Amino acid sequence: MKASYQNHDLEMFFSTNLAQVDGAVNAGIEAELNRQNQQIELIASENIVSKAVMQAQGTCLTNKYAEGYAGHRYYGGCEHVDEVEKIAIARAKQLFQCEYVNVQPHSGAQANGAVMLALLQPGDTILGMSLDAGGHLTHGARPALSGKWFDAVQYGVNKDTLEIDYNQVRELAIEHKPKMIIAGGSAIPRIINFAKFREIADEVGAFLMVDMAHIAGLIAAGEHPSPIPHAHVITTTTHKTLRGPRGGMILTNLEDINKKINSAVFPGLQGGPLMHVIAGKAVAFGEALEPDFKIYIKNVISNAKVLAEVLQNRGCDIVTNGTDTHLMLVDLRPKGLKGNAAENALERAGITCNKNGIPFDTEKPMVTSGIRLGTPAGTSRGFGNDEFKQIGEWIGDVLDGLAANPEDNSEVEKHVKQQVQKLCSRFPLYQ
């Protein structure tokens, strides 16, 4: 009887689906899918992956421990996951035209941390972009590890153009002699001059690290200059504009740096890689090598320009007066609004974005004077210029309504939400 019970139990273990095993978690997943279906996603760091990428992540590869690298694992039974990881690496090398790639970092932050572990010592000076100017926490912000372990100096933007102040970068580099200069960020709407950054880095003998997390898809599609010829090392996430699973990656053309990076990722910073996620990365890189991906990225940029233009026509102040990329920053001060209030109002109307600091912002990070908007997810869904024109008008309606009636903007929000849901019903996800 006991053996029979165990056999039945095992049969259930391998065959019972999530809804039957854990209704609470399944309900949360179903609710999130419903939210994604019914809301317009404008968070610039989010995107929508293909069904194939999701399927790759939900496979038996989640069972496999594979510490080390292909051909040099600390566990047996890795011959098949070795092949998957090698596919991911080969596709990434082809996509970005570089010599060496590490696809094991669990996130962009882990990738950045691994580079610093490989090339720096605690107490070394780093020069990165300040958060309020458009940088990222991992580029030397005080609350982050990079701001605690290193002497972090921050550059910003020109007060007139609100674009990267390369003169300031050079002046700070000459003054502080950083061991590493970091280019890239989380809210930069204009093209980055990587050649100029390398010129400055060479002048002071610094490593140049480029964090291309937000623009990796644009670079892969040839719609933004590549940092590969200029940077000593490049990091990225694999989601955002690359439209892959949530994860990180490190690239370089230099063999000596590659060896240090590999040692820093494992065993320096991580243990076993997430092989199911690496499988998803491989699938996404394969998708990005297809001609359709170039069309997709062109549409992302075109949609961003359309959205920025509509918002400007509605009286919004767009930082740098437009965008070259997938994202834009909206300065809400002329409308008398705060970023957190605008984010909440737009979400009530079915449009998700994030509050965001703007250059020289005096508000706290949980308040802010702006919002950040991006077009990757909407474009993945199938929205084109016409849809983004309408979305821009809806955003204008909500912001104007909030400015006129900050205590109760419910009528405007309710009306916009109804229209948003009608639009979303025409572009369903995962049907």
Swiss-Prot record:
Pathway(s) this gene product operates in, as recorded in its UniProt entry: One-carbon metabolism; tetrahydrofolate interconversion; Amino-acid biosynthesis; glycine biosynthesis; glycine from L-serine: step 1/1
Catalytic reaction list: (6R)-5,10-methylene-5,6,7,8-tetrahydrofolate + glycine + H2O = (6S)-5,6,7,8-tetrahydrofolate + L-serine
Taxonomic path: Bacteria, Pseudomonadati, Pseudomonadota, Gammaproteobacteria, Vibrionales
Superkingdom, taxonomy of origin: Bacteria
GO MF term list: glycine hydroxymethyltransferase activity; pyridoxal phosphate binding
Keyword field: Amino-acid biosynthesis, Cytoplasm, One-carbon metabolism, Pyridoxal phosphate, Transferase
Annotated PROSITE patterns: SHMT
Example of a GO cellular component annotation carried by this entry: cytosol
Site label Plays an important role in substrate specificity, positions: 239
The gene coding this protein: glyA2
Modified residues (N6-(pyridoxal phosphate)lysine): 240
E.C. number: 2.1.2.1
Name the UniProt record assigns to this protein: Serine hydroxymethyltransferase 2
Function text: Catalyzes the reversible interconversion of serine and glycine with tetrahydrofolate (THF) serving as the one-carbon carrier. This reaction serves as the major source of one-carbon groups required for the biosynthesis of purines, thymidylate, methionine, and other important biomolecules. Also exhibits THF-independent aldolase activity toward beta-hydroxyamino acids, producing glycine and aldehydes, via a retro-aldol mechanism.
Organism: Photobacterium profundum (strain SS9)
Subunit structure: Homodimer.
